[in-house]
Amino acid sequence: KQIVRYLVVLQDGRLFVVNTRPGDDAGLTLASRTNVYRSPGQDTWYDELLTSGNRILVAGYSYAEQASEITVLTINDAGQLQREATYYISSNDYYDIENYATRLVNGNLVIYTPLDVSNVNPRRAMRWPVVRRWLRDGDRRAVTTEGRSLFDGNDIYRPVQRTLEPIVHSVSVCPLGDLSAGDELECRTTAFVGGEDREFFVSTTDIFLWVTPNPYDA
């Protein structure tokens, strides 16, 4: 991604900032680099890089937290990076080689998250998705805020036809604002039940999500 004179590159959980006009001349020099991950052994897969103004967002999936991980950073005029916040949004692994899950639109984070409910134990209380802010790393898992609920069973739109392998598909719109220390994300979420396969598209004014059954389940 390009921000003014800088190229921002995501590689193996690291961000590299390359100055394309060092000394106002043509060329390439490394301005800064930082790790998105906080530990080399962290079980997280980073695969999406978004930019808006001087803000950078890296999305991935944390298998330890069983959540989508969103890290927000800023870049200054010298190309130096500063971490603003890291959030966890409860979900199954969203990765799709042919599609994306996040977008930045008019200062809002727009994120798609799936939740597989085909094997829910009816004898146990359902743990509905929440969005949590990272505070510090613990011995085995991250220490986070309690978080805010995204939706519960009463908020989900039922499918219009019988669904063999039901997935709760949700789209959340979360204003990023200033992200002051301790702030939670205030997300508006729409959730509905559908088939496993999906296509996600976001414009500046609308969000589209198509879902279809997995052809192998037919």
Question: Each predicted region: which residue ranges?
Answer:
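Beta-sheet-rich non-transmembrane sensory/scaffold domains
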Residues: K1-A218
